Regions:
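Glycine-rich NAD(P)-binding loop of the Rossmann-fold in SDR/ketoreductase-type enzymes
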Residues: 40, 70-84, 120, 124, ...
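C-terminal substrate-binding subdomain of Rossmann-fold SDR/epimerase-dehydratase oxidoreductases
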Residues: 179, 184-311
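Conserved internal alpha-helix within the Rossmann fold of NAD(P)-dependent oxidoreductases
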Residues: 42, 82-85, 134, 202
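N-terminal Rossmann/SDR dinucleotide-binding element
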Residues: 1-54
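Conserved Rossmann-fold NAD(P)-dependent oxidoreductase catalytic core, especially the SDR/UDP-sugar
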Residues: 57, 83-125
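Conserved catalytic-core motifs of eukaryotic protein kinase domains, centered on the activation segment
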Residues: 22-24, 65-72, 108-112, 160-161
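NAD(P)H-binding glycine-rich loop region in Rossmannoid oxidoreductase-like domains
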Residues: 39-77
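NAD(P)-dependent short-chain dehydrogenase/reductase
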Residues: 135-190, 195-206, 234-236
């Protein structure tokens, strides 16, 4: 929607596994073209890319649990379809390709500020294939084709295509509807970014001069906060009556990234707080924009994949 609002002509290629009403408010927009299809179908990809001068590649089987349900399916979409997509983009005349990777490619680091030049140590196939795609994309960087990768933190807040299976959104959903949230451990750091800031990061990279971003990789996050602080921020928004329970855990892994590079080079700094993300969700709950938010499978990637016949 932001691209349309900014005057771009937009083509969306998607399977619409979460429903075909994601762009309900924009279906009749003159500058929106929707192509329902599979990324692995080269004819469909060529159709979608026709006339495009930039590609923002977001499509994948997202998160480790969903990927592990069917590793062969995950590999076919997340890795095998990637090089053909890049090549088809070049054939179609696109001159910029922005890849949504993941901050999980770093694995577990002891350093306080995990930056883009650090060695990648992905722990799962999902993360490993993200790292592989980054390297594939760099092979195609040229004066005529600007290749850029963003490694986002975990996205939070309200969106038309809503996920309620990521940490801030999970906490807010449970706090609002159950009036109780449980934190396991609590000192583990988790990087997050508000959906509006995430969109802004893509726009900044899209609009930047080629010489600024060609072949570059950028982290994009807001803050690295302990899970306990995330829960307290959610409670402060939802209500003091929310019961916050802390229990011990054997999983004390922390994830933390530095977003200094994208700030220094492109001037992008995330501005929306965790409390704002929680408030956006509360507003959506109160307006009944997210019905059956505890049970509807469309909000939970793994449940949606379990019920899908995608092969």
């Amino acid at each position: 929607p932001r691209l349309l609002d900014d005057g771009y002509k937009v083509t969306v290629l998607d399977l619409y596994l979460s429903g075909e009403d994601v762009f309900a408010h924009y279906h009749k927009h003159a500058d929106l073209r929707e192509v329902k299809g599979d990324l692995r179908n080269q004819e469909t990809v060529a159709l979608a890319l026709d006339g495009c001068d930039a590609v923002i590649h977001l499509a994948c089987i997202s998160n480790d649990p969903s990927f592990e349900l069917n590793p062969d399916l995950g590999k076919s979409i997340n890795l095998d379809a990637f090089r053909p997509l890049v090549e088809k983009s070049i054939e179609a005349g696109a001159n910029r390709f922005i890849y949504a990777s993941s901050s999980s490619v770093y694995g577990i680091k002891d350093e306080k500020n995990v930056h883009e030049e650090m060695t990648l140590e992905p722990l799962t196939d999902y993360s490993r294939f993200k790292a592989d795609c980054e390297q594939i994309l760099l092979e195609y960087q040229s004066d005529d084709f600007t290749a850029v990768t963003i490694r986002p933190a975990t996205v939070c807040g309200y969106a038309p295509r809503q996920r309620l299976d990521v940490v801030v959104n999970i906490l807010t959903n449970l706090a609002y509807h159950k009036r109780e949230i449980t934190v396991f451990g609590g000192e583990q750091l988790r990087p997050n970014i508000h959906i509006q800031d995430m969109v802004e990061a893509y726009l900044v990279v899209l609009k930047a001069e080629s010489h600024q971003v060609a072949g570059k990789i950028y982290n994009a996050g807001y803050e690295n906060q302990p899970v306990r602080e995330l829960a307290e921020a959610v409670k402060a928004v939802v209500g003091t009556d929310v019961n916050l329970i802390t229990t011990p855990t054997d999983d004390n892994r922390s994830y933390h990234i530095s977003s200094k590079k994208i700030a220094d080079e492109l001037g992008f700094v995330a501005k929306h707080t965790i409390k704002q993300a929680a408030q956006d969700l509360v507003d959506a709950f109160e307006k009944n924009l997210l019905p059956d938010s505890l049970t509807d499978e469309r909000y939970f990637n793994i449940k949606r994949m379990q019920s899908s016949d995608l092969q």
